[in-house]
Amino acid sequence: LTDTDTYVTAVAPFLRDRGLAAPDADLLRAALPHVRARARTYAEAAFALDYFFREPPELDAQAAARFLVPDAGPALGELADALADVTPWRADVLEERFRTWLERTGRDLKQVAQPARVALTGRSASPPLFDVMAVLGPARTVARLRAAAAMAAGG
């Protein structure tokens, strides 16, 4: 298995080919473990890593049509508010806050997880949701959830 520094150097040109100039090396190192096992080539890794670097993430039209629907808008906005003050910003803490919020609001994981995934990644398939949030960081996670809430609501 290629060591992380070598992999980072090798995948960077493929990210540039996707229009992502000079990807942040620290962000790349943080995101890499979440996509590396599934990527068979550096090009596949660059595709899998794309949404960690692109603002806003490219939306898969089918995923958006299926999951960013009007009913999802309020939930995504409320989720953004519920996560905005999480500290420390780690996957386990985010999951705990998310599940507490679900219980408090009477929502089901199935109602919110896929719309949140599409909001954060632009796709219906990704690494675990809380890992994605942890790598994206609080500002981008909350901003993407709010943008998707507005989109889902038709605004």
Regions found by a protein language model. Give the residues of each.
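Small-residue-rich helix-loop
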Residues: 3-105
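Charged substrate- and nucleic-acid-binding regions of tRNA-handling and nucleotidyl-transfer enzymes
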Residues: 92-152
